[in-house]
Amino acid sequence: ASRELEHVRCYLNLERIRFGAHLRVEYAIETSDFFLPALSLQPLVENAVRHGVTKREEGGTIWISARETEESYQVTIRDDGVGFDPVRVRGDGREHVGIENVRSRLTAQCGGTLCIASQEGVGTVAQVRIPKTGDTQGKESFDADHRGG
């Protein structure tokens, strides 16, 4: 996860140059010693910048945290941007390719999940969860077959 977090940090440094005081970023990284598929965070952070905080006249803040729980690793990307109505977005007929690609990579490569919650006028929270034990619905047989035993 440290490589993905570093890519996000570099991306946000560039965006902060572009948007100045309108884009604030805070980090709370307790752990980064776990597997995270490539390009599983940057699309979420890009959405927070492009569709969240920079849509507010006064800008806003993006908070990125990573922590370990007993059963999983969690990376949370939260913003205080404009938010959105999930029902309207789901029904607008557009495909949300970036988010679906992230969700697919997480599921396929590590049994992870992506949950997104948003409220208009409040902001958005995207949470990635990576189980410590891997995908319990199919990954065990793959692992057993490829462990050499």
For each feature predicted by the language model, list its residue ranges.
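Two-component histidine phosphotransfer core
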Residues: 1-117, 125-127
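C-terminal end segment of the histidine kinase catalytic
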Residues: 119-149
